[in-house]
């Protein structure tokens, strides 16, 4: 079933609002793209306003991790999702969102972008003590 972002057909009191027109395509929405750690990188494409194509990341294998001390950015393999403050469900199922802490080849990193809306995972390297505290 589709997601609809139009106005509710009920008033706050529970009374009915009679629609003056049908639902329009531009009022349609999409379920969120929940990015997972996978064996192969996979994108999810969806239609945007004006026929544009929005790309989200469905499965991620690598992340661009920036080291704040040296200023270097490395493309490293993602091993697992350690913590996700967005939701316990996301943490349990290993969903990558902005703010999630992931374990990479070079250490723990905090995700700084929204991979469900951008086809890449960007992160900043953090110290082991910061994550535990």
From Swiss-Prot:
InterPro entries: Ribosomal_eS8, Ribosomal_eS8_CS, Ribosomal_protein_eS8_arc, Ribosomal_Se8/biogenesis_NSA2. Residues 1-34 are annotated as: Disordered. The keyword tRNA processing does not apply. It comes from the Archaea. One of its GO terms (cellular component) is ribonucleoprotein complex. The keyword Zinc does not apply. Keywords: Ribonucleoprotein, Ribosomal protein. Gene3D superfamilies: 2.40.10.310. GO terms for molecular function: structural constituent of ribosome. HAMAP family: Ribosomal_eS8. Belongs to the eukaryotic ribosomal protein eS8 family. This is Small ribosomal subunit protein eS8.
């Amino acid at each position: 079933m589709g997601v609809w972002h139009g106005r509710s057909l009920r008033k706050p009191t529970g009374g009915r609002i009679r629609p003056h027109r049908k639902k329009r395509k531009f009022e349609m929405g999409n379920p969120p793209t929940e990015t997972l750690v996978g064996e192969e990188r996979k994108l999810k494409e969806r239609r945007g306003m004006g026929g544009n194509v929005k790309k989200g990341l469905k499965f991620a294998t690598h992340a661009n991790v920036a080291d704040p001390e040296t200023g270097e950015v490395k493309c490293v393999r993602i091993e697992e999702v350690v913590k996700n403050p967005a939701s316990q469900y996301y943490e349990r199922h290993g969903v990558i969102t902005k703010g999630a802490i992931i374990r990479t080849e070079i250490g723990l990193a905090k995700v700084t972008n929204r991979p469900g809306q951008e086809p890449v995972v960007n992160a900043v390297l953090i110290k082991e003590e910061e994550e535990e505290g």
